[in-house]
Each structure stands twice: as C-alpha cells, then as structure tokens.
Amino acid sequence: MISSRSISLATLLASLLLPMLASATSPSPPAVAHPEFYPSPDPVLKTMPFSEAVRAGDFLIVSGQIGSLPDKMALAPGGITGQSRQAIENVASVLRRHGATLRDVVECTVFLADMKDWPAFNTVYKEYFKPPFPARSATGASGIALGARVELQCTAYVPATAK
C-alpha cells in the first residue's frame, strides 16, 4: 500500500524535476545579436559623430539624409524638388551599400524646413515609393543641416538571411 507520505514525496520530486527536464529538451532561445554600426564611406561624413546606418536584427536604420550632392557638402539645385529627389537618392545609396533597396523601406520620417513644401515633397516621394507606402511621419523643422529644405530618415526591413 502506498502511503500519503510517498505520494507527497513523489509529487515534490516531480514538481522539481519536470521543469528541469522540460528545459533540457527545449531549444535554447536564439542569441541576441548586437547592433552593427556602419560609418559613411564619405571622408567628410566619416568624421561626423553618427553612423550612416545601423543594423538592429532584421532592420536597417538609415540616418537622416539631406539633399546634398554625393562627395560634396553642397545642396542639390532646384529647391525643394531637387533636394527631395537627392535626399531620396542618398537614402537609396546607403541602402544599396548595405544590401537593401527602397522597396525594403517600412518607415520614413520627413523633416521639412517649411511645411508649405509638403505637397512638392510628396510629388517627388511618389516617384520613388509606390503603394503600399511605408509608414511615414512629416514634421516641420528649423535648422536642418547646411540650410537644407528637407531631411529624410528611413528604416528598412532586411532579414539577416537576405543580407
């Protein structure tokens, strides 16, 4: 005959051993990858205190891009239209360097020196981004670098296996 003391001891042992056995057969959680920071290849930008992009897991975060001409500290001509086009081209260049395209972009934040430029920016934006559009915010901002009329920061979804 089994005593109540034997049942209590068996219950205690089971409650202690079962969680250990379950964890021994369960796969361990994947290691958390640390962010990767990518400096700009541009000699001038390389000296600035920011990365051109950061990979965090499956996301590639592109630092704000203004409409500056490649390898120059000068803005593209053509006002908001020319600067918007160049800013998006600059985002596309950073994405390409890190294995992504504008089609991978899932979020953009737009900083406009004058919110009256929003319609003109949207016209250019729609030349590059097609439905379904990335999530997006736009805000008025004063003091954009180099006196730019627009700055664009984007995040792309690029699974590490596709990198």
PLM features: residue spans?
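N-terminal presequence-like segments and the immediate start of the first folded domain
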Residues: 9-89, 93-98, 103-106, 112-163
